[in-house]
Regions:
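Divalent metal-dependent hydrolysis catalytic cores, especially in the metallo-beta-lactamase
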Residues: 13, 29-58, 73-86, 113-124, ...
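Amphipathic alpha-helical segments in well-structured domains
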Residues: 25-28, 59, 183-187
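A glycine-rich helix N-cap at a beta->alpha junction
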Residues: 61-73
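Histidine/acidic residue-rich metal-binding segments in metalloenzymes
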Residues: 65-67, 99-200
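Flexible glycine-/small-residue-enriched beta->alpha junction loops
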Residues: 81-105
Length: 204
């Protein structure tokens, strides 16, 4: 047998037959207790691209579940995954809810929850750099995800505070040919930018 510190899961959508987007306290507690049985003592519940109404429900339920969570891995903040993603790299995200960042919308979201600690975004979208700067001013981590950005766009994003990459290799650009030229993508940028941190889905 082994004794070790508890795991901290920084990107988790559910567990034990529950999803955080179910929008119920029971789902949140069920996920927390399931993961605790396997050694996770803290986690960052992660959303999916959805309607703003569903997002607001998640914010309210998170607060209730956090106060009631006595047996499971503790909730240490929310990770918003979407809706500001590239349609070309949407992966498992609902393409019907993808959009570009607009200050009126994301400021409303930020005002609605003080629990957001990370927001995954495609940095090449119009308005994404400004959003990254806003998140940094709020001490929220902007993270690169579901993106078709080229290397130069990633560098610009990094300079604006996007210092992390969500599930590297999954739903993101690599070397592509555009007209007569080849461009490095997010995968290459992850290796070339020394201080960029990355997240890997270890089970494939």
């Amino acid at each position: 047998q082994y004794v070790s510190p508890g795991f901290i899961d920084i990107h988790v959508h559910g567990g034990g037959g529950h999803d955080f987007m179910d929008g119920t306290v029971e789902a949140f507690l069920g996920v927390a207790e399931t993961h605790a049985r396997y050694g996770t003592t803290a986690m960052v519940p992660t959303t999916l691209t959805s309607t703003n109404e569903e997002l607001m429900t998640t914010f309210a339920v998170y607060q209730k579940a956090k106060s009631l969570n006595k047996k499971g891995g503790q909730f240490i903040g929310l990770h918003l995954e979407g809706p500001y993603f590239s349609p070309k790299q949407c992966g498992a995200q609902d393409p019907n809810h993808l959009k570009t960042p607009h200050p009126d919308e994301y400021n409303t979201i930020l005002e609605a929850s003080q629990d957001i600690v990370r927001w995954s975004i495609a940095p090449e979208l119009a308005g994404a750099i400004e959003l990254g700067e806003k998140l940094n001013s709020c001490h929220i981590l902007p993270s690169i995800a579901h993106t078709d950005a080229i290397y130069e766009e990633v560098v610009k994003a990094y300079e604006a505070g996007y210092t992390h990459i969500t599930h590297l290799y999954s739903a993101m650009s690599t070397i592509t040919r555009r007209n007569a030229y080849r461009y490095a993508g997010v995968v290459e940028a992850a290796y070339l930018i020394d201080d960029m941190t990355v997240e890997i889905i270890a089970d494939g």
